[in-house]
Amino acid sequence: MFKLIEKNTWKRKPYFDHYFGQIRCTYSITVNIDISVVMSFKNKNRTKLYPLLIYVLTKAVNNHEEFRTAINDKGELGVWDTLLPCYTVFHEENETFSNIWTVWNDDLMTFLSNYERDMEMFGGNYGIDAKPDTPANTFPVSSLPWTTFTGFNLNIFADGSYLLPIFTLSLIHI
């Protein structure tokens, strides 16, 4: 569900107007995070790392209204109650990737089950959207697991109204 923001009473209005209207710009930040707890869980439970990281990112995004603030297809400012991850899946056979989205569930094991089901059903599909009907309340997660980087900047060439976070993961050194 997308809840409209009443801009005139919104506490962030002056900041939004300043950065969205006066000095239009984009932001990019690269953060190194400690995933030792995630790795411990992965090894103990024999799960895959990528879906665990997608879960952690989605949980963080859904815990912060600022990350769920968006402009809908009607040009209205609002907040999604929940965002779903839309992540890339690499196809080694032809060196392309596809997007798959997964229904969010705060319970880790349920989310991992949803992820595995989506991978079984859509992971072998080629083309940009392996799973059809991507909902509007998704945010992108991708991975470049063959390279390490300490900075990454993705510029969306559009009208500048895309506000949701975009995550790109690199090779992980343990």
Identify the role of each PLM range.
Residues R24, H91-G151:
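Helical lid/core segments from catalytic subdomains that handle acyl or acyl-like groups
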Residues I172-I174:
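Conserved small/polar residues in nucleotide/adenosyl-binding loops
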Residues C25-M39:
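Short amphipathic alpha-helix starts
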Residues A60, H64-R68, F122:
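Amphipathic alpha-helical interaction segments
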Residues S143-I166:
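Glycine-rich active-site loop/lid that clamps phosphate-bearing ligands
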Residues M1-Q22, V79-L84:
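Short amphipathic alpha-helices and their capping loops
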Residues V38-N63:
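Acyl activation and transfer enzymes in specialized metabolism, enriched
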Residues F67-I100:
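Small-residue-rich loop/turn and linker elements
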